[in-house]
Amino acid sequence: MRTTLFLFLVWLQSSVALPSLQAASHSLFDGKTFAGWEGDTNQWWRIEKGNIVGGSLVRTIPENQFLATTRDYTNFVLKLEFRLTGTNGFINSGVQIRSQRVPKSSEMSGYQCDIGDPTWWGSIYDESRRNKLMAQSDMAALNKVLKRGDWNHYEIRAEGRRIRTFINGAQGVDYTEADASLPQWGKLGIQIHGGGKAEAHFRKLSIQELP
């Protein structure tokens, strides 16, 4: 009886203590300033009505532009809302995770959780590193929930070498990195792709860091 009671108390204590290991979610954007972020805020990134906006609908964006966090993250649940619109050329955006700035360039190097037609939504592309698609999203599932030209919810879960993407609750990919040499930490970033007249809007950016 004493052994059973002891084991129960140990289980109860561990169950109560477990939530304290999970960090609370916090906002990445204050809605007013670029505090905690860096990029070309003189030309390609701005704040409008409490949202981050990248790009232009009247000028062709000559090269990829990224707004990046000033600190690194490893394991996390990242949530945000995005809206992608465009008038001409390649209309595309994305969210960088576990990435690095490329010296003397506007680029970032690392995993990009993509945004855009025809089938980039929710896919993972290795930006400025392996330069190839690492995981194609389930477009059959995403097409049922996507709101093109309107606001969509993006959730990205990075845990160990596993990365999962969700758009409006539907899973895009479940990818596990096979190359043990690649860093599983780095900066976050949001992109407006070069080669088009397009705008990417972002709001409600928050992150919950995981152990």
Where would I find each of the regions flagged by the language model?
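Carbohydrate-interacting regions of secretory-pathway proteins
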Residues: 21-211
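Positively charged n-region of N-terminal signal peptides that target proteins for export
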Residues: 1-4
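Bacterial N-terminal signal peptides
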Residues: 6-17
